[in-house]
Amino acid sequence: ASDVYKRQTIDIYAKACGVNGNVGAVVNFKTTDPEGWDKVKKPKCRNACDAVVYECHVRDFSADSSSGVAPEHRGKYVAFADKGTKYQGVNTCIEHLKELGITHVHLLPVEDYATVDESKPWLNQYNWGYDPKNFNCLEGSYSTDPYDPKCRIREFKQLVMALHENGIGVVMDVVYNHTYYTEESAFERSFPYYYHRIRNDGSFSNGSGCGNETASNHMMMRKFMIDSLRFWATEYKIDGFRFDLMALHDIETVNIIRDELNKIDPQILMYGEGWTGGESPLPADRLAYKWNSYQFGRVGLFNDNIRDSIKGGTFNPYDKGFVSGNRNAASTLRRGIAGSVPHYQINDAKEACWAFEPTQAVNYCEAHDNNTLWDKLCISAKNDSEGVRIKMDKLAAAIVILSQGMPFIQLGQDFLRSKPRILKEGEAPNDVNIYSHDSYNAPDYTNSIKWNRKLEYKEVFEYYKALIRLRKGSPLFRMYTKEDVNAHLHFMHNDDWNCVSWKLEKDGECYVIALNPYYENRGFGLPEGSFYLRLDESGKMNKQPVSGSFVCPPLSAVVYKRIKTVSYTHLTLPTKLE
């Protein structure tokens, strides 16, 4: 009949597609498995607090020639499988990941997105990927042949396999909160006005800030999300999921997803952003906001409180934090150090101690959004020398990595990643505009990792590496419950409130961590017993016994460890220092 309205669309459940994701493909997934795929075991991670997450964009990782990756693999999934990569003697790419000691790679979106034309690779287009088109298909621009539906699947499995073989888990950044297209999306073409939230006036609500938001509270949208996540977790052996704008999803759906992932593997990480990009019509008490965290206690949330206390407010580039001279940041910082759970020594407002358990706190001071930590310090501490700013950066790293919760680091942060911005014609350079604070579609000049910086700032990398090794070496830095945090983490008294120190103690093991935000030496006290300097401001150890007190250098963090003793009838001997 002439009044029948016909639409053509790719299946919303399509798991493979052709170039640019316009047409679905039927694929035998068994034929896409790399050799040895079935034999590779997933890395073990008992608890989120045992993870050290490293955020990577597939293209950034290897696009620059300094990556040492084969030219045809640069910017592609398969770059992660290139072995032995170096730049002038320093490890790059996967060799770098192994050397640093992180446990998980968090990949910015690799699901098929709309804003790079896969048929024109010579245009060198770039996008972070938060523009979802097909939720169950892989992005083709990261494959060596976007026209072959199997190619991207096989090559992404090679990426996963290469990381798993080296004991590194894979976290996917998933963007179920909106679609890039609204009326033209596969959701609307398949079942109009169901998969998206609609306002009372019939318009699309826009809690994402991207033109629409999906309706996770609708039964079939919820089912779609669960089915999709189960597919990624089983077919690709994914080890974790990070939810973009997670607060747009209703709490009930978030909890059901956690239950479903537990059935596959309870060690799968699940965390997300506890905020939205705009106003949603769903009542705030039903949404997975950070302040509702006690209603979904098994899911992690980005800790913007500790982020801003460390380096200053994100949206004012000149704003300073604890490491760069803000003397009012120490209170918020203490809460973050204790995993953002209620602590017997912190008598602040309930919302400040927002986490139900320390496993919920994703501690960070840099991610793909906004200025890198180094660029932020170059703006807010522009009058300080580079050497002083390096001290600030290392102090920030110590706070993130040694706090209770799950540490999260951006690719290249460990060697002072910078995102230089290309100025527009006629634009005069100033303190702020020479750095990109929103590089979502900036070229490789801005976004790609320049591995020569690792060579240039090797001492910074070595410090991050030493911090990660220290964290992984003792469960005291990785406590799972608020009860443990309250029993075994004690803030120590200092005459100066801005000098922060705390003691971690259990079963005869004792650490004292001190943070000095001043430009001069500061003295700190020690508990009873003999200690040695486990980690100095360079990441090194000094076995000389110390008792009573110690001096912390300017703008530095240091860690002391009590020397264990073994008692015999007439003799007490120190045990081996480690």
Predicted features and spans:
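The feature marks proteins involved in alpha-glucan
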Residues: 2-75
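Hydrophobic faces of well-ordered beta-strands that scaffold small-molecule active sites
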Residues: 54, 105, 170-172, 241, ...
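Substrate-binding/active-site clefts of carbohydrate-active enzymes
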Residues: 59-236, 249-265, 269, 281
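Conserved alpha/beta catalytic core and glycan-binding cleft of carbohydrate-active enzymes
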Residues: 258-259, 263-426, 513, 518
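Conserved, mostly hydrophobic/aromatic
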Residues: 56, 107, 232, 243, ...
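Loop/helix patches that line or flank the sugar-binding groove of alpha-linked glycan CAZymes
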Residues: 356-529
